Amino acid sequence: MPGSLKEETALLLEDYFQHRAGGAALPPSATAAELRRAAAELERRERPFFRSCAPLARAEPREAAALLRKVAAQLEAEGGLNWGRLLALVVFTGTLAAALAESGCEEGPSRLAAALAAYLAEEQGEWLEEHGGWDGFCRFFGRHGSQPADQNSTLSNAIMAAAGFGIAGLAFLLVVR
């Protein structure tokens, strides 16, 4: 079990980014499994948007990390963090990480995982702790429905309600970039 919020966050993000790139067959924890499931649902629902983000990585981890910081600042400026916005930020960063990996930048995904973990644990750590940390994430995304079909539908609605403004902010930032 990780010793700190930053360490736990880094491990979860590294697992998700590896999974997103086709590796990491089994999730190392229930939290990692929930993150994968919720992220896959958001990415499926907003596939065209996230696909349009991939070219923004530009095969350079520093540029991708700078873009991540801009997007995080924009989300914060547009009303702060919530679980949906956090998830949208993770999926957005996972898209950049996968694009870097596909372009041959092996250190890109781990650098982005470290940058996002630092942002979430250091700049948003108080918010995360107030909302139950990653256990709170699992409670938020895992509480919807008991049947798989019902759960997926309700999960989709919950994600989109919580992430809607975050995705709009991401899209705005990317258009004006």
From Swiss-Prot:
Span of the annotated motif BH1? 75-94
Give the UniProt record's GO annotations in the biological process aspect. Answer: extrinsic apoptotic signaling pathway in absence of ligand; intrinsic apoptotic signaling pathway in response to DNA damage; positive regulation of apoptotic process; release of cytochrome c from mitochondria
* Topological category with respect to the lipid bilayer: Multi-pass membrane protein
Q: Which domain of life is it from?
A: Eukaryota
Q: Which GO terms describe its molecular function?
A: channel activity
Tissue expression, per UniProt? Expressed preferentially in heart, skeletal muscle, retina, optical tectum and bursa of Fabricius.
Per the UniProt record, which residue ranges are transmembrane? 86-106, 156-176
Localization, UniProt: Cell membrane
Question: Motif BH2 located where?
Answer: 126-141
Q: Which InterPro entries does the protein's record reference? A: Bcl-2-like_sf, Bcl-2_BH1-3, Bcl-2_fam, Bcl2-like, Bcl2_BH2_motif_CS
Q: What PROSITE patterns does the database record attribute to this sequence?
A: BCL2_FAMILY (PS50062), BH2 (PS01258)
Q: Name one Pfam family in it.
A: Bcl-2
Which family would the database say this protein is a member of?
Belongs to the Bcl-2 family.
- Describe the function of this protein: Shows anti-apoptotic properties. Counteract the pro-apoptotic activity of BAX.
Protein name (database record): Anti-apoptotic protein NR13
The opening ranks of the lineage are: Eukaryota, Metazoa, Chordata, Craniata, Vertebrata
